[in-house]
Amino acid sequence: MSATPRPHDLVWLNHASALEDIAEPWVAQQWRAALPVVVRRDVDDQARVPVGVRGMKREQRAAGWVQARNIVRSVTPEMLVDREVLLHSPFVSQPPVQGAIALTLHRWPWGWGVTGSTGYALATEIPVLHAASDLDLLIRAPQPLDREALLEWQTRVAQLPCRADTQVETPYGAFALNEWLRDGRALLKTSRGARLTATPWHREE
């Protein structure tokens, strides 16, 4: 893979042994290379890519690492909100997918996508969705975004047929949109931990 994987990307590996430093025993029993892992936020002195593995149970999540050369396929959150992908999904009747379809009807001034269990289901067609599933949304924001446009997004998200939360990804980390709009500051999740900030588009001094 030539592109650098980013947090929330789903990546497929060339072999099961490509998954490194996994301690949880259930991973060997449940995970196989045909299933993607999700890129997470972390740093490594060996320049490996931080990933997470999801198991069959909600609480089964394991953190590990992979060498970039062992990644053979990548699906970004943005790729999963192509309207044709959504309309032809076997989960099109589920509320989170209906919510994503509703958001595609408006032209937004930023790139956005779907993560979490909805993203995993759309990418794999594995039935991890149900009627009460949340819709996890991601906005890519390399530059500061217009507050009024974000308020419009939040208004539309509040009207979706499911619970939905939006993370905004800046060059320095990600924060919860509702928290930032409500309080004027938010907890920015970075590769080296979280920090409370009112300026998520600025590097911490």
Curated annotation (Swiss-Prot):
InterPro entries: Holo-ACP_synthase (IPR017557), MdcG_C (IPR049180), MdcG_N (IPR048903). It is an enzyme of class 2 (transferase). GO terms for molecular function: nucleotidyltransferase activity. Its EC number is 2.7.7.66. Keywords: Nucleotidyltransferase, Transferase. It catalyses: apo-[malonate decarboxylase ACP] + 2'-(5''-triphospho-alpha-D-ribosyl)-3'-dephospho-CoA = holo-[malonate decarboxylase ACP] + diphosphate. It comes from the Bacteria. The active site is at 134, 136. The keyword Nucleotidyltransferase applies. Belongs to the MdcG family. Transfers 2'-(5-triphosphoribosyl)-3'-dephosphocoenzyme-A to the apo-[acyl-carrier-protein] of the malonate decarboxylase to yield holo-[acyl-carrier-protein]. This is Phosphoribosyl-dephospho-CoA transferase. It comes from Klebsiella pneumoniae.
